[in-house]
Amino acid sequence: MVFIREKKTDCANYREVDIIPRTEAAEQATRGKRGRKRKSNAPKQKDLNDKNAKRYLVQLGNGNFSIGDLHTSCTYSEENLPGTVEEAEKIVTNYLRRIAYRRNKLGLEPLKYILVTEYKYTKDGQSIKRIHHHIIMNGGLDRDDVEMMWTKDRINWKKTSDPEYRASIKQLGWVNADRLQMNENGIEGLCKYIV
C-alpha cells in the first residue's frame, strides 16, 4: 500500500510543502549499523546534495531576513588581494566583527548574517583569482557606514560626517551595500545567485 507523507517547512512568511510517496515496507524497514564509506558519492547523489544545500540557504534567508536588511558585495583591489582563502576569511571575519561592534555601540540588535565567499582557482590550480564575498545581513546601520567599514584603517566615528575624512579612508576594494528586494518568493533569487 502506498501513502503520501506531507512535510511542511515554514520560513517567516513563506511555506514550502514536500509531498513524499511512501510504502508500508519503506516505513517499517529498519536499518542496521552503517558500514564504512568505501567509495565517493554518485553524481546523482552529489546533484541532490547540491540541490538540498541551495534549498536550505533559501529557507535560511527567507526565515531570517526581510525588507530593510542588506546585501553587501565586497571585493579586493590588486594591492589588497589575499593570497589564500584563509587570509580572505580572516579579513571578512574582522569586517563582520567591526560591524557587530558598531551595531552594539548604537544599541541595535545583534548582527545576523549569511556569508558566501566566491573564488576560482587558476588553470594550473596553484593560486586563487578574484576572490570576493557576498554577505546578507540584518539592517539598521547606514549603508554608507557599512561600505566605509570595508577597510583596514581604524575609523574615527566622530569625524565621519566630514566628507574629506570619509574620502581619506582607504578601502580594501570595491564594496556595495544594497537593500534586499523581495518578490513573491522572498530573497530566493539572491540566494540562488550567491550559491
Predicted regions span which residues?
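Conserved His + Asp/Glu catalytic blocks
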Residues: Y121-I131, M137-V195
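DNA replication initiation on ssDNA origins
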Residues: M1-L60
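Generic structural motif
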Residues: I4, V17, K112-L115, V175
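A short acidic, often aromatic-flanked loop/helix-cap motif at beta-alpha or helix-coil junctions
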Residues: A12-R15, R22-A25, L81, Y121-K123, ...
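Signature for HUH/AEP ssDNA processing cores
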Residues: K46-I128
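N-terminal nicking endonuclease/strand-transfer module with a His-rich metal-binding environment
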Residues: E24-A25, N62-I67, H71-S73, N176-E184
